[in-house]
Design a protein with these regions (language model features):
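Terminal amphipathic alpha-helical/low-complexity segments used for targeting or macromolecular assembly
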Residues: 1-123, 184, 189, 195-196, ...
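Structural signal for interior beta-strand "rungs" in well-ordered beta-sheet cores
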Residues: 59, 119-271
């Protein structure tokens, strides 16, 4: 198996991503919880109870997993007050009212990706009339066509294509091989994972003299603030009128949103 991270030495620096660690007391303070047990224990990551090692934080959110909590090698366990009595008294722990709500804060600390450096990669192809906000990061082999507007802090990873007339808000993240079709509008803090296509023509044909004539799709694809779309998903543009995803919508991988669909705010869809 993989070796456990070496415990830190006095004065060790703590990089924001990779090799991070916290003492149990520091971890409890970060999440507004109570530390019990070995208060100087160093925690360097989060893992399931079954797979955790001495430097990992485990998670107990349901009494069904009390046996796993008793057998775990985790250095400490994140637990709620009503489940705390299920732990061995010697088990180090961080006690919080709602471990599920606390978990994102812990995961972001230990596993957050390093921020990309602002700048334009030398292999990127960018039209002359593109308007880029401050702090934009454009990766290798990105293509940005004419009349595109991108807000500040936006990141385009390798091989992204942004077609003409698209509008991207602030702090948008497009992962590798995303394609944004013409005249798409992305709100602020939108995240599109690898292989996503937005603004694609919908599936529309008309019978004409024994053949099928393609119906042009001329509507927009409008995606609200804080939307996240999973890998290899597609969102079609409207035929006449728009396709719209409201703010805070979350789509799983391999989801297809057809033309002229309206998805309300805070909707969550799992893959089919």
């Amino acid at each position: 198996m993989f070796p456990e991270p070496a415990p830190p030495k006095s004065g060790d620096a703590r990089p924001k991503s990779g090799g991070t660690w916290l003492t149990l007391v520091e971890l409890a303070a970060m999440v507004g919880g109570r530390a019990e047990g070995d208060l100087d224990k160093h925690i360097a990551g989060v893992m399931s109870l079954a797979q955790a090692g001495p430097s990992d934080l485990g998670l107990l959110v349901d009494s069904r997993y009390s046996r796993a909590a008793g057998e775990t090698a985790a250095g400490a366990i994140l637990v709620s007050p009503n489940l705390e009595d299920m732990l061995d008294p010697a088990q180090s722990r961080v006690v919080v009212e709602d471990p599920r709500k606390t978990l994102p804060t812990v995961l972001e600390y230990f596993f957050s990706d390093p921020l990309p450096r602002p700048g334009l990669h030398e292999t990127a192809i960018i039209a002359e009339d593109v308007k880029l906000g401050t702090g934009v990061s454009v990766g290798p082999y990105v293509v940005i066509e004419d009349n595109v507007v991108m807000g500040e802090g936006t990141t385009l990873h390798a091989h992204v294509v942004v077609r003409s007339g698209a509008r991207l808000g602030r702090d948008v993240t497009l992962h590798p091989h995303v394609v944004v079709y013409p005249h798409v509008r992305l709100g602020d803090r939108v995240v599109l994972h690898a292989g996503v296509r937005v603004g694609v023509d919908g599936f529309g044909y008309a019978h004409s003299e024994g053949s099928l004539a393609r119906i042009p799709h001329v509507g927009a694809c409008i995606i609200g603030d804080d939307v996240e779309i999973g890998a290899n998903s597609c969102v079609d543009r409207g035929s006449i009128g728009h396709t719209e995803l409201g703010a805070h919508v979350k789509l799983d991988n391999l989801v297809h949103i057809g033309h002229n669909v309206t998805v309300g705010p805070r909707t969550v869809m799992a893959a089919q």
